[in-house]
Amino acid sequence: MLTLDTLNVMLAVSEEGMVEEMILALLASPQLVIFFEKFPRLKNAVTADLPRWREALRSRLKDARVPQKLTEEVMCYQQSQLLSTPQFIVQLPQILALLHRLHSPYAAQAKQLVESNSTFTPSLHTLFLQRWRLSLVVQATTLNQQLLEEEREQLLSDVQERMTLSGQLEPTLAENDNAAGRLWDMSAGQLKRGDYQLIVKYGEFLAAQPELKQLAEQLGRSREAKSVPKKDAPMETFRTLVREPATVPEQVDGIQQSDDILRLLPPELATLGITELEYEFYRRLVEKQLLTYRLHGEAWREKVTERPVVHQDVDKQPRGPFIVCVDTSGSMGGFNEQCAKAFCLALMRVALADNRRCFIMLFSTEVVRYELSGPEGIEQAIRFLSQRFRGGTDIASCFRAIIERMQRRKWFDADAVVISDFIAQRLPDDVVSKVGELQRLHQHRFHAVAMSAHGKPGIMRIFDHIWRFDTGMRSRLLRRWRR
């Protein structure tokens, strides 16, 4: 069976303009406009998806099959082009019968054209084929538009689902444009509303515990380089780009009258296939009165200013991935569990903003792993937040898992974060020795987030930094009173 791509090539129909028109119409839809106004950070992330959308639409048009009736008509047209005028006159009754049988839009016009001329001349032969081809072009264009409309509805439905998900999670997980882009990429998974509401719930809990959120941000960015500007610096030229309006065709701004065929409205194109309106279409084309999409865009202009030269002495330190180990023993249940999960969510937020990896390991009697910064990060985060802290405490296994992962090439600059109340047995000497070696030779940093004031000093002595967040009732009341 004939493919739509082959038909477009045969009739010289360009689908590129229709694809671009559909993309522009999609971007101009009220749903996306409102979404971009509400979540401006996600606009760039959605825009970055446009090449993938275009490729998917082209692939859909390329693989689509042409209906059998249209295929037969196209084949008949192709064969008729090879006939001379005398041969064509002989085959004309069969051609008219075929057009009638196929219910071709050109059937009535072809019959009228033959009956209104007693003599079938070569010029009439040429006119017959030209109008037949025009009818086929209109049919092919209509078929392309029908398929694109179906794809637009499906694409809009998918985008709306992802917008709902991203919009719900943006306040919790998207700190900057980079995080918004990664969050949009993660939203491509199959998630239900009830699933990601768990992240929203812990995001609200984190917002109600500003000290916990601040602690996570301090820990996550504790490796930031320190810079000291020098004084009495000379002036230097500083160039910046300033945005200003332009006429670059970037997004739909309305409707105008012109002769731009590529941006023609579908109702205008439909008049081309109606015999009574055909000459009216060409008249309006010549007079530039066809209704088309009006586009506008933005341009950048270079602005030159003078400012003092600022040199900075920077002690750069690498900012690698997080390996977070969470104690899921029974003593970490209740409010401790909520704080530990919310703290991991805050670290995930930092990782997304700084383009870092965030790997979670739960330790009790066994080690369970989740990667919150991968393509399936949202699903992994939901699984992690769904866990219950009811196991035992095997902190030695946790450290062995950290050591084993840090020895891999991809994790050579990772930071380890252990979240626990540190009410556990002392660590074996071989584990303590290996941790010290990683700290000394490879500059790995080990952070402890202590959820209790009663953690054993012997365990916590091996950490580079100890971040305390006491979850006792007295400390909770004091924090609430200070707010």
From Swiss-Prot:
Keyword Chaperone among record annotations: yes
The GO cellular component terms are: cytosol
Per UniProt, the keywords (alphabetical) are: Chaperone, Cytoplasm
Q: Which CDD domains match?
A: VWA_YIEM_type (cd01462)
- Pfam families per record: VWA_CoxE
Report the domain of life of the source organism.
Bacteria
- Does this entry carry the keyword Transcription? no
By its UniProt entry, which SUPFAM superfamilies does this protein fall under? vWA-like
Q: Where in the cell is it found?
A: Cytoplasm
Q: What assembly does the database describe for this protein? A: Homodimer. Interacts with RavA.
Role noted for this protein: Component of the RavA-ViaA chaperone complex, which may act on the membrane to optimize the function of some of the respiratory chains. ViaA stimulates the ATPase activity of RavA.
The family classification in the record reads:
Belongs to the ViaA family.
Give the matching NCBIfam families. Answer: PRK10997.1 (NF008230)
Q: What is this protein called?
A: Regulatory protein ViaA
Q: What is the lineage of its organism?
A: Bacteria, Pseudomonadati, Pseudomonadota, Gammaproteobacteria, Enterobacterales
